[in-house]
Amino acid sequence: MPKGLVVFATRTGQTKRIAQLIAEGMRFEGYDIDVFNVTEIDNGGISLDDYNAVVLGSATYHGEMLQSMKKFLFLAEKSNLDGKAGGAFGAFGWSGEAPGRIFDTMTHIFKMNMVREPLRLKGADLGGGIKMAQDYGREIARKALA
């Protein structure tokens, strides 16, 4: 069974909810999924090399991703993610820059095989967000299996 990892950084719980929905979409495609709040992971806590797909998300706060996700990205750079399927997501109130910055890091620095674009939602339960997040998870899972 393929393995996927979803790691999120949240302030109000919306990004966590989106992470859970993305994981659900990946499970629909037959994936075994681990979901972690980035604060639960210590410096050497998990090996990203063990996963077929890696999905990272952060809320946007004052135009930036949360500091805990920035720190995690520096740690993730030490892993071999070249060519692995990936996606980036996040919740936002006003501007929503964090998912795009994570996506760019995963594309250009980690050299991952990313889905078409990051998923940006004001909230998981608003405007079709549940289906959008589940479909995003399905898309990532299919990309990893292609």
Each language-model region and where it sits:
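Nucleotide-activated donor-dependent transferases that construct or modify glycoconjugates
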Residues: F8
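Short acidic active-site motifs
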Residues: E40-I46
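FMN-binding flavodoxin-like domain, especially the glycine-rich phosphate-binding loop
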Residues: P2-G4, R17, L21-V38, D49-A146
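Glycine-rich NAD(P) Rossmann-fold beta1-alpha1 loop
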Residues: T12-K16
